[in-house]
């Protein structure tokens, strides 16, 4: 089970981060076909570990007799294995206390140096960001699981989860949201990942929680759905200068900059930063909006306070307030991640914004997201990411987003859906 708020944020801690490679597809019209063929090849591969887990299997796709719901029934907590799984002799389990500044610094360095994404790109997660992503209200410290070398005490692996509520059809299910799975790059052949997943699963069950949600850039089993990541350049000159994209054919730098230029200020009347007093209204907007999706996050006021109230350098949220009624009518948000750019004399970091959730009722969705692009540009972001879940597909091309090759596969652990979903049927904010 893996994914991140730290990716995106969002699989490195990942989880709250998506791929920051901005190399655009050469042929947008054929990309879907190519991706489809690649996925078919991946589907044919077997994953021995996941074939032993209570997850949806490809062999069951045509079996209409299988019911929706839990794959394995819950048991008594007293029947759950009480002792941790055994590690190889030179390793030991540890709890990662994110309230400790020293632990946060160690985690920062570990994730930065061992991100499973592009080796040339290093994600930067401040201690404030790590605590926001990993320690929401009601979190379990025992779910922040590390592996150390016994002799040196060096951290060499990390997995974590947090409790959440996810509505599947008409049922709200308590689940674990798996935020991150990261193993030291030199130890990935030691078989640690499956063991860490089993250990986290054991600890989740000890809290009487029997389902989980996670994402991965890899095909592990049959996904609930698969989304594609899209990118919108905010600072094209910088992105071209650092080599993350290039000028398109017959385009000059000045024409490219002009193509992606945004207004100096948001254009929607009543658009302002979200405040604490807006929490009940934003919660109501979110719950109403997410009710249309087959699988969605179940938000309450406490969730909104933690995940969506603005925090500098972490999450940015905005509302539209009607000038006539003074009601909150629309909402948009994005979180951020900084990336180290090695070997560039002019730039050392890239600032990335990731769309969280956009709810448009009186404002058009494209105008609302365009305002989000404007304020993210004002805040100094260089690039803006979004995936084609929920209703996002409706604005992507209009606002000059371009598709990336990277995809995110969404999974439910110990829960079966009879049919896979379209990305537009998914309302998970992970």
Curated annotation (Swiss-Prot):
**Record's InterPro entries?**
Acyl_CoA_acyltransferase, NMT, NMT_C, NMT_CS, NMT_N
- UniProt KW Acyltransferase keyword: yes
What reaction(s) does this enzyme catalyze? N-terminal glycyl-[protein] + tetradecanoyl-CoA = N-tetradecanoylglycyl-[protein] + CoA + H(+)
GO BP term, pick one? protein localization to membrane
| Entry EC no(s) | 2.3.1.97
A Pfam family: NMT
Provide the family line: Belongs to the NMT family.
| Purpose of the protein | May add a myristoyl group to the N-terminal glycine residue of certain cellular proteins.
Q: What is the protein name stated in its UniProt record? A: Putative glycylpeptide N-tetradecanoyltransferase 2
Origin organism is: Arabidopsis thaliana (Mouse-ear cress)
């Amino acid at each position: 089970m893996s994914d991140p708020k730290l990716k995106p944020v969002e699989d490195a801690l990942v989880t709250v981060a998506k791929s920051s490679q901005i190399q655009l597809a050469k042929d947008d019209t054929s990309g879907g076909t190519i991706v489809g063929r690649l996925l078919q090849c991946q589907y044919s591969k077997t994953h021995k570990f996941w074939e032993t887990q209570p997850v949806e299997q490809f062999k069951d796709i045509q079996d209409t007799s299988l019911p929706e719901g839990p794959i394995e029934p819950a048991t008594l907590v007293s029947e759950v294995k009480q002792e941790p799984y055994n590690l190889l002799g030179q390793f030991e389990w540890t709890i990662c206390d994110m309230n400790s500044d020293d632990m946060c610094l160690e985690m920062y360095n570990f994730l930065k140096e061992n991100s499973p994404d592009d080796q040339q790109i290093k994600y930067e997660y401040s201690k404030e960001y790590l605590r926001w992503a990993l320690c929401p209200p009601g979190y379990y410290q025992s779910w922040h699981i590390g592996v150390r070398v016994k002799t040196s005490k060096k951290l060499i692996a990390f997995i974590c989860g947090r409790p959440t509520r996810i509505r599947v059809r008409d049922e709200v299910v308590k689940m674990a949201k798996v935020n991150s799975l990261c193993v030291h790059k030199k130890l990935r052949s030691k078989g640690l990942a499956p063991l860490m997943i089993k250990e986290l699963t054991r600890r989740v069950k000890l809290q009487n929680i029997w389902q989980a949600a996670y994402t991965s850039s890899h095909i592990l089993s049959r996904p609930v759905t698969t989304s594609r990541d899209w990118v919108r350049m905010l600072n094209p000159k910088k992105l071209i200068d650092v080599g993350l994209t290039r000028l398109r054919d017959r385009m000059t730098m000045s024409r490219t900059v002009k193509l992606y230029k945004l207004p100096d200020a948001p254009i929607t009347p009543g658009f302002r930063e979200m405040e604490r007093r807006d929490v009940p209204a934003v919660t109501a907007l979110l719950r109403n909006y997410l009710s249309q999706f087959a699988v969605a996050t179940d938000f309450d006021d406490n969730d909104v306070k933690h995940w969506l109230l603005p925090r500098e350098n972490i999450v940015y949220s905005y509302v539209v307030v009607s000038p006539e009624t003074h009601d909150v009518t629309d909402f948009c948000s994005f979180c951020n991640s900084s990336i180290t750019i090695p070997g560039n004399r002019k730039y050392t970091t890239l600032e990335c914004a990731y769309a969280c959730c956009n709810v448009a009722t009186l404002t058009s969705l494209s105008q609302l997201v365009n305002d989000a692009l404007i304020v993210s540009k004002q805040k100094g972001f260089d690039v803006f990411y979004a995936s084609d879940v929920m209703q996002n597909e409706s604005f992507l091309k209009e606002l000059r987003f371009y598709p990336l090759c990277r995809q995110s596969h969404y999974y439910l652990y110990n829960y079966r859906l009879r049919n896979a979903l379209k990305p537009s049927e998914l309302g998970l904010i992970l």
